[in-house]
């Protein structure tokens, strides 16, 4: 929900959009009224319009938002914002739609971002906003960074897929949330600023960048964790996906708050990763300092070349890299590093990331959000580091429907590294679950050869698959439940079914006589 604000003069919004080159004045109407004010936020969802608010019509994949203008007006919208095609559509909806003041813009998504920031009073300018992007590791890195900054005396809010923090407290997140849409994002930044936090760590996805959700934010710094092919359902090609991620570099400009705190604009990028070379080049071309991070062979963290021994509660090299990225930023900003290291060492990590489920059983159960090929490979590496001699890795995995089909092949190939594999539903949405499972099975089977039929089981019922894997575990084994992590729903046929991966694991352990779940 947006914070309560005094009514705002629409003229100042018009001036802002004009200054940014978004306003199409000749196609706008009704903007000469001196009494035109907004008393409620802007939104692109007609169902969320409040009396006195504005409705931004965005052309979507299935419908043009302008078709919902009448509903927005019925709910009390006093201003419409639309691109020219939407303006023409609105003009056919009757006298009420024609008479309401309308701002025509060249880019409705960008206008939504700017209007949302304008309504909330540009909270990002009151904060040092750090964006964390990359294919995998964003949530853990963002969590480590918020923890590190706060411990170093620079209190930080957090907006991430699995966790939100405001003023030192934690808040629940929306189901399947990525980077929130601009109205919700700006409202959350206002909450963080109002709570007295000085920074906001924002998990910044390619969707958030490509769809202009973060277009009104001047970042103080950015972190790129890694880059591999993903989200081709949105971007089409790896090149377009990379271009979307590179937009973060363009947005690292510093805010009023970060400049006042003398925080140098930075990009934290691992130079040893060849896939990140374009990000290094873009940052250097923009005159932004690049801060390096890495992990030594013996596990020490390398913060821009400086070696630090940092014991972590989260196991595995991937989590060490995430911690190194976060601490490299703290060190580069010359904040108290010892305090930050101590806090990161104690950080258990976000829910659903290398999360252990312990009920006293003689084998380990790990819940992890890993849902791409590279992240599953990393999670399997972490799980294998926990095996005792002779132990087996038992894996439950899957892939989402209506998403990049290439992800399924990558997940299947990664899954082949497990001794036993159960392929279960993740979020089939409106896609045939058998088709999804077959893609994963076939990819794994190509690598497993003749043993595939013995090692792979397709069991769509995720609860049953988890129970089967845990029932099959012997002392010294590790059961890895991959793909859902922290998420609290399974999307199937337009319905969000309640789900809790950790609870499902505990239920299976209890049925085997291990009741003391933690």
What feature does the model see in each segment?
Residues 53, 72, 115, 132, ...:
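Residue-level signal for inorganic ion chemistry
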Residues 81-89, 160-163, 271-275, 486:
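Short, polar loop motifs at secondary-structure junctions
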Residues 82-85, 204, 226, 271, ...:
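Short secondary-structure boundary segments
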Residues 1-114, 247, 315, 335, ...:
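N-terminal leader/targeting and accessory segments in enzymes
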């Amino acid at each position: 929900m947006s914070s309560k604000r005094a009514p705002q003069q629409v003229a100042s919004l018009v001036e802002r959009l004009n200054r940014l080159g978004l306003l199409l004045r000749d196609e706008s109407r009704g903007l000469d009224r001196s009494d035109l004010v907004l008393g409620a936020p802007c939104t692109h969802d007609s169902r969320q319009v409040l009396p006195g608010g504005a409705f931004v019509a965005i052309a979507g994949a299935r419908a043009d938002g302008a078709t919902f203008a009448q509903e927005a007006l019925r709910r009390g919208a006093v201003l419409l914002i639309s691109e020219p095609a939407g303006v023409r559509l609105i003009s056919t909806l009757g006298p009420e739609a024609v008479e309401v003041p309308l701002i025509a813009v060249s880019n409705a998504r960008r206008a939504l971002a700017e209007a949302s920031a304008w309504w909330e009073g540009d909270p990002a300018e009151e904060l040092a906003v750090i964006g964390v992007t990359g294919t995998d590791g964003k949530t853990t890195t963002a969590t480590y960074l918020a923890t590190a900054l706060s411990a170093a005396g620079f209190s930080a809010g957090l907006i991430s897929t699995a966790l939100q923090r405001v003023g030192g407290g934690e808040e629940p997140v929306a189901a399947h949330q990525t980077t929130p849409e601009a109205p919700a994002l700006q409202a959350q930044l206002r909450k963080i600023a109002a709570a007295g936090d000085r920074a906001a760590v924002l998990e910044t996805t390619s969707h958030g960048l490509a769809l202009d959700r973060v277009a009104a934010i001047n970042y103080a710094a950015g972190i790129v964790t890694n880059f591999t092919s993903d989200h081709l359902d949105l971007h089409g090609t790896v090149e377009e996906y990379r271009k979307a991620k590179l937009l973060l570099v363009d947005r690292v400009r510093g805010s009023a708050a970060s400049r006042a705190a003398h925080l140098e604009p930075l990009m934290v990028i691992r130079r040893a990763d060849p896939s990140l070379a374009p990000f290094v080049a873009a940052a250097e071309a923009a005159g932004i300092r690049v801060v390096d991070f890495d992990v030594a062979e013996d596990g020490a963290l390398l913060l821009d070349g400086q070696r630090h021994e940092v014991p972590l509660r989260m196991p595995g090299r991937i989590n060490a890299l995430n911690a190194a990225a976060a601490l490299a930023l703290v060190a580069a900003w010359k904040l108290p590093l010892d305090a930050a290291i101590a806090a990161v060492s104690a950080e258990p990590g976000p829910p659903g990331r290398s999360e252990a489920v312990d009920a006293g059983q003689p084998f380990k159960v790990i819940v992890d959000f890993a849902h791409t090929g590279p992240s599953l490979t990393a999670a399997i590496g972490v799980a294998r580091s926990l095996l005792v001699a002779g132990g087996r890795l038992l894996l439950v995995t899957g892939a989402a429907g209506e998403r990049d089909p290439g992800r399924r092949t990558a997940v299947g190939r990664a899954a082949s590294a497990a001794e036993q594999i159960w392929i279960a539903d993740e979020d089939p949405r409106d896609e045939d679950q058998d088709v999804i499972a077959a893609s994963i099975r076939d990819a794994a089977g190509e690598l497993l050869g003749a043993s595939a039929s013995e090692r792979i089981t397709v069991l769509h019922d995720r609860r049953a698959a988890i129970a089967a894997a845990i029932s099959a575990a012997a002392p010294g084994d590790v059961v890895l439940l991959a793909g859902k992590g922290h998420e609290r729903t399974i999307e199937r046929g337009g319905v969000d079914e309640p789900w809790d991966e950790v609870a499902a694991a505990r239920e299976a352990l209890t049925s085997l006589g291990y009741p003391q779940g933690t």
